[in-house]
């Protein structure tokens, strides 16, 4: 029964507005307290922003940089609130983490022209893992509000030769838009997508881990954007066009009558008179 409840809960969360995930998640947990831990670990929530007091830069919060009630900043490598003996990446990974944050900072600026990004790395038995977080919220100009949250988790298995590695990418994107215009009223549109991809790639000075991961994330985000555009925006446009028309009812009837007259005229023209 609990497994069926979990499947139904996840299916419901996929269909509810992303901007209300936290509220809906709390409501679901109130209805089914036994699912609390599974729901919290399975449902991606919108990213929250904090500020690094040492560097004065924003960073994003998630389970991967959390230890207790404190969150580690990728810029200073410090926990806020301060925490003794918090989990830290190895020296090698910390160096890679710094490079990755600067690389994806440039990527975010190029593609999103603003927003906040953070990258966190941690050690695994046969390699390491990373999470790339990107958040861009609309400023509300032109009566449009919205937010994009993308979470990319990469598992890297380094081969014994050190020349190749296996990458497993799991990406989730959450997008919502809200328009409020006098002519059309208020409209909400949102959704989320999760996709996976695996590949092997060479590792060298000219093709390091950051470049390989960056290429996978870039390709995945482009695929997700195209899918969201086709499914959510394309289908919504078709539905709205089917519900509303720019023509008046009188014009539609006149156009239909004209089509019938043309069809009848063509039919009469094609019918040959019988010969005596």
From Swiss-Prot:
It comes from the Eukaryota. Keywords: Actin capping, Actin-binding, Cytoplasm, Cytoskeleton. GO terms for cellular component: dynactin complex; F-actin capping protein complex; WASH complex. One of its GO terms (biological process) is regulation of actin filament length. One of its GO terms (molecular function) is protein heterodimerization activity. Coiled coil: none annotated. Component of the F-actin capping complex, composed of a heterodimer of an alpha and a beta subunit. Subunit of dynactin, a multiprotein complex part of a tripartite complex with dynein and a adapter, such as BICDL1, BICD2 or HOOK3. Belongs to the F-actin-capping protein beta subunit family. This is F-actin-capping protein subunit beta.
């Amino acid at each position: 029964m609990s497994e069926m409840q979990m499947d139904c809960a996840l299916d419901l969360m996929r269909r509810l507005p992303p901007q209300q995930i936290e509220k809906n998640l709390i409501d679901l947990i109130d209805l089914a307290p036994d699912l609390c831990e599974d729901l919290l670990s399975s449902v991606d929530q919108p990213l929250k922003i904090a500020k690094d007091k040492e560097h004065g830069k924003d960073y994003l919060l998630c389970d991967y940089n959390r230890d207790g009630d404190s969150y580690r900043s990728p810029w200073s490598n410090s926990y806020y609130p301060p925490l003794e003996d918090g989990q830290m990446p190895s020296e090698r990974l910390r160096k890679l983490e710094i490079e990755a944050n600067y690389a994806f900072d440039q990527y975010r600026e190029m593609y999103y022209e603003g927003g906040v990004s953070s990258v966190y790395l941690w050690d695994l038995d046969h390699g390491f893992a990373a999470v790339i977080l990107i958040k861009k919220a609309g400023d509300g100009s032109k009566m449009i509000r919205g937010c994009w949250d993308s979470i990319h988790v990469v598992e890297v298995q380094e081969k014994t030769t050190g020349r190749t590695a296996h990458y497993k990418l799991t990406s989730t994107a959450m997008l919502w838009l809200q328009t409020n215009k006098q002519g059309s009223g208020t409209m909400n549109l949102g959704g989320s997508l999760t996709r996976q991809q695996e590949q092997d790639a060479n590792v060298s000075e000219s093709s390091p881990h950051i470049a390989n991961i960056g290429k996978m994330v870039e390709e995945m985000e482009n695929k997700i954007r195209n899918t969201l555009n086709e499914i959510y925006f394309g289908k919504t446009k078709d539905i709205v066009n089917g519900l509303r028309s720019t023509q008046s009812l009188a014009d539609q009837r006149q156009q239909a009558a004209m089509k019938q007259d043309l069809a009848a005229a063509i039919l009469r023209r094609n019918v040959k008179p019988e010969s005596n």
